[in-house]
């Protein structure tokens, strides 16, 4: 990214960001209304505004009046369950109140649909009357048992706030260059398709000269059938947050951004809950653990 684009992108900042404005606009505005004003304010083209609004499921103008969305991910479609599911929802809510979206992350269960900020799947459609009334239902869970003994994803080293605090305290006493050296020698790679060495990435970022640095966690599982980090996001949110905090410490960044689509409400709930508790305990925000290191998360 060029220095000019970086400057333009950070001109207004995260607290008043374009995506938030688009979300507000999708609720309160008519199709196409206000595009020029937003484009001028954020110094982007009108086509960029339109492209973003038409790309994201919850921002699309044609979806504003919808009450439910049927998953059209590849697994659900191949299972052949969605046509009848959509018909049942339309009978209950009305033909014009049911839309479609990709993918809700229930590829193992099918019959997946989204209603009023929650995802449902499997036999949940049989409880549609209770769901529409707002009654709390007991959802069937897919239970698995792990016999792993060495996997960081499965262990309990960051299973609660106290362990988070103790481990963070230890890391903040380490020299940043030593953490990078350890990462480089570990051969740890990113979780993306490129498998880029984490140590190299953090090293480059720590040496980059910039007035402001951000730590970005792209938790979007945009490809149909690719909600591969669901366990990590829903059951191990502290590990995701811990990695971002340590990254901020090492590279000299004081602000992080977690990007998750609205299609995954359980992940959003788990991460928001953890972030709020960490802020209450002083483990996110200004002068963490009485040090000169500050890091906030959005």
PLM region descriptions:
Residues 1-298:
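Feature of Fe-S/electron-transfer and energy-metabolism proteins
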């Amino acid at each position: 990214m060029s220095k000019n684009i970086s400057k333009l992108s950070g001109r207004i900042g995260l607290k008043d960001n374009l995506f938030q404005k688009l979300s507000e606009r999708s609720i309160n505005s008519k199709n196409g209304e206000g595009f020029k004003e937003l484009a001028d304010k954020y110094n982007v083209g009108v086509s960029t505004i339109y492209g973003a609004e038409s790309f994201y499921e919850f921002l699309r103008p044609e979806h504003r009046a919808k009450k439910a969305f049927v998953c059209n991910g590849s697994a659900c479609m191949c299972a052949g369950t969605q046509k009848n599911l959509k018909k049942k929802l339309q009978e209950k809510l009305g033909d014009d109140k049911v839309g479609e979206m990709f993918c809700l992350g229930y590829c193992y269960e099918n019959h997946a649909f989204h209603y009023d900020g929650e995802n449902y799947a499997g036999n949940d459609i049989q409880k549609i009357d209770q769901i529409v009334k707002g009654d709390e239902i007991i959802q069937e869970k897919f239970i698995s048992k792990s016999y792993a003994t060495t996997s960081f994803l499965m262990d309990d080293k960051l299973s609660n706030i106290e362990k988070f605090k103790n481990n963070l305290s230890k890391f903040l006493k380490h020299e940043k260059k030593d953490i990078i050296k350890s990462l480089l020698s570990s051969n740890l790679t990113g979780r993306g398709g490129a498998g880029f060495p984490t140590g190299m990435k953090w090293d480059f970022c720590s040496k980059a000269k910039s007035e402001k640095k951000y730590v970005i966690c792209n938790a979007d599982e945009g490809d149909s059938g690719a909600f591969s980090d669901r366990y990590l996001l829903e059951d191990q949110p502290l590990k995701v947050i811990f990695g971002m905090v340590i990254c901020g410490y090492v590279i000299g960044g004081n602000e992080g951004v977690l990007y998750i689509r609205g299609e995954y409400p359980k992940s959003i709930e788990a991460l928001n809950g953890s972030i709020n508790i960490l802020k209450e305990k002083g483990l996110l925000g200004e002068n963490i653990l009485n040090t000169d290191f500050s890091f906030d998360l959005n």
